[in-house]
Regions:
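Ligand-binding pocket scaffold of soluble enzyme catalytic domains
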Residues: 13, 22, 37, 60, ...
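Active-site-adjacent scaffolding segments
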Residues: 38-129
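Core segments of cupin and vicinal oxygen chelate
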Residues: 4-6, 10-52, 87, 95-103, ...
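Vicinal oxygen chelate
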Residues: 1-5, 8-17, 45-46, 60-84, 88-136, 140, 161-178, ...
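Active-site/binding-pocket entry motifs
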Residues: 53, 63, 181-182, 191
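Internal amphipathic alpha-helical segments of the cytochrome P450 catalytic fold
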Residues: 23, 54, 82, 93, ...
Length: 251
């Protein structure tokens, strides 16, 4: 049987007030190839890395909420997913919309108001490779964990699993797709910071978190949380010159 791929983070977008300046920043920091799309295309600027289309940059005034990074999850049927979002305590921000003959999307807010994309796309390449320059992890925090887990399981198609570290159950659920944990939702305060609504956090792979943090500063960005060690590597939380927050992590 074909591998069930619903529930994996399949697309990211950066909503920015200056696409060209943002392109220069991320091109230098992560080695991306960023090109303006042709007029009439659904994307404004295309981001490629290691031969794969991984993201787009869009104008800030097109953002469904605050500008910054947004993630979308693969679903089997976008209308069913949108209905599930309403049923599980969230709400639909953008109704299911066809983009091409094989692609449709909707935007929904989870019970805490964090906006997430729901994408039905027959041509999606599958989960992002686990390597430098790629988005390698995604998570969000919830004021009430169990309703949030239900929302992401039913609306975003996550095959959820309670995270266990050293035989201790954590206040955190992961989405396990193809045998690999690809994203998660945790209780507010899980990372030591009470921040709800938070917003979806995207982690990009780097070879050296400390060197990457220095480069962020040199390029006009901000280091929000200095590099630190955690269970799976070393990471740093940063913002680009326009304030879009993300994380850089070794792997």
């Amino acid at each position: 049987p074909a591998e069930r791929l619903a529930g994996f983070p399949c697309w990211i977008e950066l909503y920015t007030p200056d696409i060209d300046a943002s392109a220069a920043f991320y091109r230098d920091l992560l080695g991306w190839e960023i090109t303006r799309a042709e007029p009439g295309e659904p994307l404004t600027a295309e981001v490629h890395h290691d031969g794969r289309l991984i993201a787009s940059f869009e104008p800030a005034d097109a953002a469904p909420g605050d500008p910054g990074w947004q993630v979308s999850f693969m679903v089997d049927d976008v209308r069913t997913a949108a209905a599930a979002a309403e049923r599980t305590g969230g709400n639909v921000v953008v109704e299911p919309t066809g983009v091409t003959a094989t692609m449709a999307y909707a935007l929904a807010a989870d019970p805490d108001g964090n906006v997430v994309g729901l994408l039905e796309d027959e041509d999606c390449e599958g989960p992002y490779p686990y390597q430098a320059g790629m988005p390698v992890w995604f998570d969000v925090l919830a004021s009430d964990l169990e309703p949030a887990e239900r929302f992401y399981r039913e609306a975003a198609g996550w095959p959820t699993r309670r995270l266990t570290i050293a035989d201790q159950e954590q206040d955190f659920y992961t989405s396990v797709v193809g045998g690999r944990s690809v994203s998660g939702v945790g209780r507010a305060g899980y990372f030591g910071v009470e921040e709800v609504p938070s917003r979806w956090r995207i982690y990009f792979g780097v070879e050296d978190a400390d060197a990457a943090a220095r480069r962020v500063r040199e390029l006009g960005g901000t280091v929000i949380v200095e590099p630190f060690d955690f269970t799976f590597g070393r990471m740093v939380e940063v913002a680009d010159p326009h304030g879009a927050r993300f994380l850089l992590t070794t792997f």
